[in-house]
From Swiss-Prot:
Gene name of this polypeptide: rplT
Keyword set includes Ribonucleoprotein: yes
Ribonucleoprotein among keywords: yes
Official protein name in the record: Large ribosomal subunit protein bL20
Record GO biological process: translation
GO molecular function: rRNA binding; structural constituent of ribosome
UniProtKB keywords: Ribonucleoprotein, Ribosomal protein, RNA-binding, rRNA-binding
PANTHER family registered for this protein in UniProt: 39S RIBOSOMAL PROTEIN L20
Family designation: Belongs to the bacterial ribosomal protein bL20 family.
One term under GO cellular component: ribosome
SUPFAM superfamilies cross-referenced by the UniProt entry: Ribosomal protein L20
Organism the protein comes from: Carsonella ruddii (strain PV)
Superkingdom of the organism of origin: Bacteria
Function according to Swiss-Prot or TrEMBL: Binds directly to 23S ribosomal RNA and is necessary for the in vitro assembly process of the 50S ribosomal subunit. It is not involved in the protein synthesizing functions of that subunit.
């Protein structure tokens, strides 16, 4: 009876850690630890990337609304809210860019 399951798991970790430096790439115990750590960092970085993109969108909306309407971002969003305009930041930015060009 061949034992393929443990070898499959070993290959999974070692295949993922191919570009790592030192024992992280070929020592199974360390490979597992750094595999889990890399997945956790990947999750955190995805969240940070979304946060950064949102900050940039808000900064652009603020920039264009100050130049063309003379309003800050918060006042611009407040006016939209008063007029029951339920648009997300992507659409607002798209519309501002379209009106400029």
């Amino acid at each position: 009876m061949t034992r393929s399951k443990p070898n499959k798991n070993t290959k999974k970790y070692l295949k993922h850690n191919k570009g790592f430096y030192g024992r992280k790439k070929n020592c199974l115990k360390l490979a597992k630890q750094y595999y889990i750590k890399s997945l956790f960092k990947k999750y955190i970085d995805k969240k940070n990337k979304k946060r950064l993109i949102l900050k940039k969108k808000i900064a652009l909306i603020n920039f264009f609304s100050r130049i063309y309407f003379g309003l800050s971002y918060s006042k611009f969003v407040y006016i939209l809210k008063i007029n029951n305009c339920k648009l997300n930041k992507n659409i607002i930015l798209f519309l501002l860019l379209k009106t400029i060009v």
